[in-house]
Curated annotation (Swiss-Prot):
Probable esterase; part of the gene cluster that mediates the biosynthesis of asperfuranone, a probable antitumor agent. The polyketide synthase afoG is responsible for producing the 3,5-dimethyloctadienone moiety from acetyl-CoA, three malonyl-CoA, and two S-adenosyl methionines (SAM). The 3,5-dimethyloctadienone moiety is then loaded onto the SAT domain of afoE and extended with four malonyl-CoA and one SAM, which leads to the formation of 2,4-dihydroxy-6-(5,7-dimethyl-2-oxo-trans-3-trans-5-nonadienyl)-3-methylbenzaldehyde (compound 2) after reductive release and aldol condensation. The gene is afoC. Disulfide bonds: none annotated. Residues 204-217 have a biased composition (Low complexity). Its EC number is 3.1.2.-. SUPFAM superfamilies: alpha/beta-Hydrolases. It comes from Emericella nidulans (strain FGSC A4 / ATCC 38163 / CBS 112.46 / NRRL 194 / M139). It comes from the Eukaryota. Disruption phenotype: Strongly diminishes production of asperfuranone. This is Probable esterase afoC. Residues 204-226 are annotated as: Disordered.
């Protein structure tokens, strides 16, 4: 399985970041980890002393995504988090909403994430896995992974990644505290309980979804149990043709857990100091408001 790509980052920087809290980064459909590393260059620069960003490759080969070949045409192979039918253009396929109607290969997604986690551990990184970050299709998968974790925690199930990492000899476990979602479409994908969870247990069969244990009152759990309540930062380009679908993902989240950053851009990652700084400011606000002492930017 493909894993993370750190070739685009100076080795010295990654050595300095070994102790920092880690964020797992999921690229958009029709790109790959190497491309996403480059697309996040401005964000990485502002977070160099705060977080270690680790970029995972998706499991499925695909055609290039929108506007990818004009800049990164020689950076293939291109990948997708969901299987795209052979010979089908990924841009037209996604625009038609086909990704919502297919069976998601949860095992393949989980294997890629486990490979990225294990490889970064082998590189000597020791920081906690504290967050997810994704763009477009990767943002949708990141939010869906966070929601799966929320269901597992509410039911007292073993998290997928901890069980899988143990099998692979890795030392990490994941307890994601937030996600940063750039241009992510709703609704959430059904990722089940993951290949390493206790999906067949009586607890799993007795409850479909709920909020993180201990984070809300019983009344709030009953009212918002179907919503993602782990904190999310949603970054929307106001000139993105898919903006309304991105706002649909916001509606899948509990309002009090959501922060929104809007910028004057299309369907791409922000790169200016001002626009990226607004995202970093929200991360800082999240760390302070949630009293995440180790996550202060």
């Amino acid at each position: 399985m493909p894993a993370l790509d750190i070739a685009s980052a100076p080795a010295a920087v990654y050595q300095q970041q070994l102790h920092l809290p880690r964020i797992l980064c999921l690229h958009g459909g029709g790109t790959n980890a190497r491309i996403f590393t480059a697309q996040c260059r401005a964000l990485r620069r502002q977070l160099t002393d705060s977080y270690r960003l680790v970029f995972a490759d998706a499991p499925f080969l695909s055609s290039a995504g929108p506007d990818v070949t004009s800049v990164y045409g020689e950076w293939g192979p291109f990948r997708s988090w969901v299987p795209v039918p052979a010979g089908v253009d990924i841009s037209a396929w996604a625009a038609a909403g086909a990704a919502s109607r297919i069976d998601i290969d949860v095992e393949a997604i989980d294997e890629c994430i486990a490979a990225a986690i294990a490889q970064d551990d082998r590189a000597g990184a020791t920081g906690d896995w504290v967050g997810l970050l994704g763009f477009s299709q990767g943002a949708r998968v990141a939010a869906s992974l966070l929601y799966r974790q929320q269901k597992q925690q509410r039911m007292g199930l073993t998290s997928w990644s901890r069980g899988r990492d143990r099998k692979r000899g890795a030392t990490s476990s994941t307890n994601y505290r937030f996600a940063v979602l750039f241009a992510g479409r709703g609704p959430l994908l059904d990722l089940g309980f993951g290949s390493g969870s206790l999906a067949g247990s009586s607890a799993a069969s007795s409850s479909a979804s709920a909020s993180v244990s201990g984070s809300e009152s019983a009344g709030e759990e009953e009212e918002d149990g179907h919503l993602l309540s782990i904190p999310t930062i949603h970054v929307h380009g106001l000139r993105d043709p898919g903006l309304e679908m991105h706002r649909d993902l916001v509606r899948s989240c509990r309002p009090s857990s959501v922060r929104i950053v809007e910028w004057e851009g299309a369907h791409r990652m922000p790169i200016t100091t001002k626009d990226v700084g607004a995202v970093v400011a929200e991360l800082r606000h999240l760390a302070i408001s949630r009293k995440y002492e180790s996550l202060r930017c």
